[in-house]
Curated annotation (Swiss-Prot):
Record-linked Pfam families: IGPS
Residue spans crossing the bilayer: none
Catalytic activities: 1-(2-carboxyphenylamino)-1-deoxy-D-ribulose 5-phosphate + H(+) = (1S,2R)-1-C-(indol-3-yl)glycerol 3-phosphate + CO2 + H2O
Organism: Opitutus terrae (strain DSM 11246 / JCM 15787 / PB90-1)
Enzyme class: lyase
Family affiliation: Belongs to the TrpC family.
Its EC number(s): 4.1.1.48
Entry protein name: Indole-3-glycerol phosphate synthase
Gene name in the database record: trpC
Amino acid sequence: MPDKLIEIMAHKRREIAPLIRPVTETELAQLDASRPKPPSFADALRRPDGTLAVISEIKRRSPSAGEIKAGASAVEQARRYRAAGADALSILTDTEFFGGTLADLSDVTTEFRDQRPAPPCLRKDFMVHPVQVAQAREAGASAILIIVRALDDAEIQALYSAAQAAGLDALFEVHHETELERALHHRARIIGVNNRDLAVFKTDLALSERLIPQFPRDVIAVSESGIFTGADARRVHAVGAHAVLVGEALMKAPDPAALIAEFRAR
């Protein structure tokens, strides 16, 4: 079976090629200073009561699930999630494979701009260049995604340095011990285990059960993909996950609040 992540990354590199330009840390720091400070993504993932934080994802479709909620309004979905008690939002901005747009992110952060506390928003995309970090900050994101397997170490460092200069957190995504080692080499503060193998898009919660216990205690642990029930959430919480990132199950849920409560139940 062809490696889907290779296909996606090749498309993403072609897509952003016309936008690539030098982006300095000074420029990003000035951008950060000129914009309202976004809420902290990292802080939202450690709940004071010790229950799982829930990152609720806005995702219209995916290569694994196909159409999930075609034509869904990002703002309306974000309102539903916020009312349901989501701790943070993940907003797909990839159009080709996931049906999202950068405007979705901007629209959602604008919607909550005057609320206190506003939900922190992750720009969920296939990041390859600091210009995408600048876009994320301009759109009001609190964090970006860094997929370790998809990038070389120089690209990871460039993205992470850009995120820090722009005042953004970074969620490092890993799927294997070697990727975890690389994330830790870059001093990642937030690491997510993607239970879905992005090569073939199959999920296995045993990945979180294997990798999260290897995280240093000061790293925020996130379990991503394959979380559909309270039992799933309890499995990953039991091995040290601070948060779960859930898309498909919440997009389809008739009552997101009930499902989020189920995820948090001990």
